[in-house]
Amino acid sequence: MAGKSSKSEWSAKKPYFTKITDNFVLNGESSRKETRHIVFDLGDSGLEYKAGDALGVVPRCPPEEVEEILRICGFSGEEIVETNLGDCPLRDALTDRYEIHRVSKKWIKGLAERSGGDAPKSEIRIVSRKRSSTVDGSLIVDWSSSGEGDVPEGYVEMGEIGDNSAILLHELISDNDAMEDYIWSRDYVDALGDFASFGFTPQQLLEGMDRLKPRLYSIASSPDFEEGTVHLTVAIVRYSHHERDRTGLCTGFMADRCETNTTEVGVYMSPTRSFVLPEDGTKDIIMVGPGTGIAPFRAFLQQREINGDSGRNWLFFGDWTEEGEYLYRDEMGDWKDRGIISKHDLAWSRQGSEKVYVQHLMEKNGEEIWNWIDGGAYFYVCGDKQYMAKDVHSTLIGICSEFGGMSPEDAKDFVETGLMKTEKRYLRDVCLLYTSPSPRDLSTSRMPSSA
């Protein structure tokens, strides 16, 4: 049984509420990363999936942040507000209906529209100056302004000053780079600290906020492995910025605020139409999945073993270090010992004097990779779209050129037209990964732009 995806009554708008039954850290004790294995019970939902699908998870906003927003604004939280899902108390709207972890441009622009868009300015002018002697009280300086631009001797004209909040707002509206930097690194607690002086009604507070969106995570299990469950491999986003500790909205929700077998979490299936195993189980597959990109390949390997497929399985995996970030080490070792994994190449970027990435190992194995592809193998990539997937893509083209006897142009056409579009043997599950405002704290998951 290969598992299947089917239409379900459960969706992003109507998720199935279930519980997490297992939630543990996969990293070694020395790791600075926090990658968790999370298992959801599907109960009597009727939800079905196949290896390669994704699970949608509906997060809830942190209650402490909700309460801080209410405190700053002076609201009780019981005020009734209008939302796209109907009327509800403001506290409920901030918890379950809006994204409060990152400020939206629309919200900032709404402030500008309400305030008229211009930074109010004030002018301070010295109109007189008197100075008396500390000895006998006699008047030493007696100066009065004679008109605009007149300043006493020894003074420098400073120009105009304005309300700090209004000046900041004017800068954000007029400078797109400043706007991007501001919204990337701040949530609504930060923003209200800057703009609370503008004043809000409960309804105005919500105007321009983004609606709360589910996050998609590549499923890390075959439906036939532990029936009635679905597994995820999730990198927890944690960082400090503007003197506050923060987490990704959904990853922090699952890691910190979901009590095992107790907290209800909304989920639904997001089927893939292309990132699937070959129908012919005798076909070889090559899988490239560093970091949490390993998730769908754990599902693939489980499914191939359960099906008894005879095709060979070649897995490229990588991360920072073997000791800290070798995810599912025991499972991978067991599969390798039993021949389920035919070849297993590991790349560690922070172990030793040289940074080694998966594309470097592909280059070293270029001739064999070409032989597999030339023999009908499928090639899969999962993970970071911006860097890793691009490097793997260009490396694959180089391999096909060098060992397939093609010009660089012909190799590019072979990969991008032949393998990807015509034969559909080159399949990718890639996305822009979330990074915290500090580039040193990069964490990964399959999710839209924010965690």
Annotate each predicted stretch with a short phrase:
Residues 1-436:
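FNR-like FAD-binding dehydrogenase module
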Residues 434-451:
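Single conserved hydrophobic/aromatic residue that forms the stacking wall/gate
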